[in-house]
């Protein structure tokens, strides 16, 4: 929903080998109507372009925007304690999908849930100073701030921790 709550999840199989395009479209149409969907987030991984093409070939009963969103870190989040606490009744695939979708709404609030250490930075990942990485992330969160309406305690706790460290160091 508009606050990032998971109301429903369902799998569709529009691509080979299942090729259930008609069934997938019918399920999507039903969900778009029932939940007043305004946007669809597609993770930028496997079959993302095929999925985007599939969605754009169909006309839904209401206008729906389609976005391809970075999946980076979604698998890290989906297996984390934070994700298990947020969605204890769902498996990692559903948790990851929710994380990707929420990135459309409030990317900072969603990405701050991901521990930056395991996120690869290509062939140079072992050259990255983890202390500097955490400090840089904290500075980014601090510079961006947060909205009063930000849902979830993770970003609020992180900002509070930054504030307390600053207050302890500087009075």
Which stretches of residues belong to each language-model region?
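Gly/Thr-rich phosphate-binding beta-strand-loop-beta motif of the actin/hexokinase/Hsp70
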Residues: 1-7, 104
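Short, ordered loop/turn segments at secondary-structure junctions
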Residues: 2-3, 11-12, 45, 69-74, ...
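Glycine-rich phosphate-binding "P-loop"
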Residues: 9-22
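Short alpha-helix plus adjacent loop in nuclease-associated cores
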Residues: 16-18, 65-106
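Amphipathic alpha-helical transducer elements in NTP-driven molecular machines
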Residues: 21-25, 48-55, 66, 94-105, ...
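Short, basic/hydrophobic alpha-helical segments
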Residues: 23-38, 57
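Short glycine-rich phosphate-binding loop at a beta-alpha junction
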Residues: 36-47, 66-67
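Long, highly charged, low-complexity intrinsically disordered interaction regions
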Residues: 85-171
């Amino acid at each position: 929903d508009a606050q990032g709550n998971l109301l429903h999840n369902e799998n569709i199989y529009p691509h080979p080998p299942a090729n259930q395009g008609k069934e997938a479209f019918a399920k999507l149409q039903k969900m778009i109507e029932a939940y007043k969907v305004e946007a669809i987030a597609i993770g930028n991984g496997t079959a993302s372009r095929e999925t985007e093409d599939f969605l754009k070939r169909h006309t839904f009963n209401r206008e729906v925007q389609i976005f391809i969103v970075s999946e980076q870190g979604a698998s890290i989040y989906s297996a984390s304690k934070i994700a298990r606490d947020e969605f204890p009744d769902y498996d990692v695939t559903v948790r990851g999908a929710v994380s990707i979708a929420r990135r459309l709404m409030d990317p900072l609030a969603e990405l701050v849930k991901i521990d930056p250490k395991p996120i690869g930075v290509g062939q140079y990942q072992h050259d990255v100073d983890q202390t500097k990485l955490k400090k840089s992330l904290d500075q980014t969160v601090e510079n961006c701030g947060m909205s009063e309406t930000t849902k979830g305690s993770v970003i609020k706790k992180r900002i509070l921790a930054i504030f307390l460290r600053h207050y302890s160091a500087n009075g």
